[in-house]
Amino acid sequence: MINGSTKIVGLIGHPVEHSFSPPMHNAAFEELGLDYAYVPFNVCPENLKSAILGAKSLNIKGFNVTIPHKINVMKYLDKLDPIAKLIGAVNTIDFKEMKGYNTDGIGCIKAIGEVTSIKDKNIVVAGAGGASRAISFYLARENPQSIHILNRDINKAKSLAEDLKNSKLTDNVDFDSIDKIVGYVSDADILIDTTPVGMSPHVNDEAIVKAEDMHSDLVVNDIVYNPNETVLLSEAIKAGATPVYGIKMLLYQGAESFEIWTGEKAPVDVMEKTLRKTLDL
């Protein structure tokens, strides 16, 4: 029951109607008996500054931040987590310190961590947008053998690769056209697809790599979670490769935000169960 002592956290974006975060977080608060409530707020870009200042005045404890505010919100914060600063985007705010974090990348690392480690692995990242950027900086921190950024717009891939090198987190990064992905996948340990290929409603898109071009030791992560089994993961299963589902990244980035706000260990099993129920899985 919400009362005068309930701590409010939430989501700001535009739009936010279809977010799966509220049920996941509210189930976690209930599981741990925490007097918190998670509420989505639809904030238009022109109202972002007043929303952040108003939230602080209202003693809101934290926000998740989604499109289109992840970059613009940074200018209204007092502090940035070092890796969020490198990524150049924030998806979590802790109002206690007016500090921004980016938990997208750690969500991906933990999802893959269920089946293998990043250390000393050859990794192919498809795409060079915001999600790729967040994930690539976290990958670089885990000491992989190599990171190959492949993108349709090769200049975007080059820019991300250069930023990774300049961060001093890794030297072992290069870039190329996504058209050459088959050659890279043959030597890869992990393939991460950050592109929207196969995302609902375009579930019949052609997979960026076919089963015949994969090998059985490959770990394949698609960050798309709707549908659960994307065209790429379907090909991975056909090839005997290990699939890592997009729902796991959604789960772990949420768990990381939960821990930043509450200081408590997230009940990941309850959060996953709720997420699966919400997604009808």
Curated annotation (Swiss-Prot):
Binding site for shikimate: 19-21, 66, 91, 104, 225
Pfam families: SDH_C (PF18317), Shikimate_DH (PF01488), Shikimate_dh_N (PF08501)
Residues annotated as binding NADP(+): 127-131, 223, 246
Any one GO molecular-function label of the UniProt entry: NADP binding
Listed EC numbers: 1.1.1.25
Keyword terms: Amino-acid biosynthesis, Aromatic amino acid biosynthesis, NADP, Oxidoreductase
Catalytic machinery residues: 70 (proton acceptor)
Any coiled-coil regions, as ranges: none
Lineage: superkingdom: Archaea
Gene3D superfamilies: Leucine Dehydrogenase, chain A, domain 1, NAD(P)-binding Rossmann-like Domain
Pathway in which the depicted protein is active: Metabolic intermediate biosynthesis; chorismate biosynthesis; chorismate from D-erythrose 4-phosphate and phosphoenolpyruvate: step 4/7
InterPro entries cross-referenced by the UniProt entry: Aminoacid_DH-like_N_sf, NAD(P)-bd_dom_sf, SDH_C, Shikimate_DH, Shikimate_DH-bd_N, Shikimate_DH_fam, Shikm_DH/Glu-tRNA_Rdtase
Catalysis: reaction(s): shikimate + NADP(+) = 3-dehydroshikimate + NADPH + H(+)
GO BP annotation list: amino acid biosynthetic process; aromatic amino acid family biosynthetic process; chorismate biosynthetic process; shikimate metabolic process
Assembly with partners or alone: Homodimer.
Protein family membership: Belongs to the shikimate dehydrogenase family.
Role of this protein: Involved in the biosynthesis of the chorismate, which leads to the biosynthesis of aromatic amino acids. Catalyzes the reversible NADPH linked reduction of 3-dehydroshikimate (DHSA) to yield shikimate (SA).
Official protein name in the record: Shikimate dehydrogenase (NADP(+))
Organism expressing this protein natively: Methanobrevibacter smithii (strain ATCC 35061 / DSM 861 / OCM 144 / PS)
Lineage of producing organism: Archaea, Methanobacteriati, Methanobacteriota, Methanomada group, Methanobacteria
Gene name for this UniProt entry: aroE
